[in-house]
């Protein structure tokens, strides 16, 4: 079946944003070995749709450095309330199970890159 997904472009791509739910949030996000960017969103929110496109664009660029998860606040109210999400889109940056940064509203791509680079610096390549 995965061969057909690959041919049709439906296979998971490295860095593709993943869904987290009330049931999976702790395991997927808080216990992640990699730093995590969580996009709290709703399908009825137009700025959220724009941010979703930015997340899909950034995902492959940060694959292996940052996991990106999306939480639909309409379907996962417990997690949204737990993180005191009052406005969407809200981006929460988590490292070692702790919030280290947060942004609300439509955020420019360069700001997202700066925050992600701060969250998970690129490895330094040294010439030998």
Predicted regions and their residues:
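Proteins that catalyze or organize thiol-disulfide redox chemistry
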Residues: 1-37, 42-65, 77-78, 90, ...
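Structural microenvironment flanking redox-active thiols in thiol-disulfide oxidoreductases
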Residues: 71-81
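Glycine-rich phosphate-binding loop
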Residues: 87
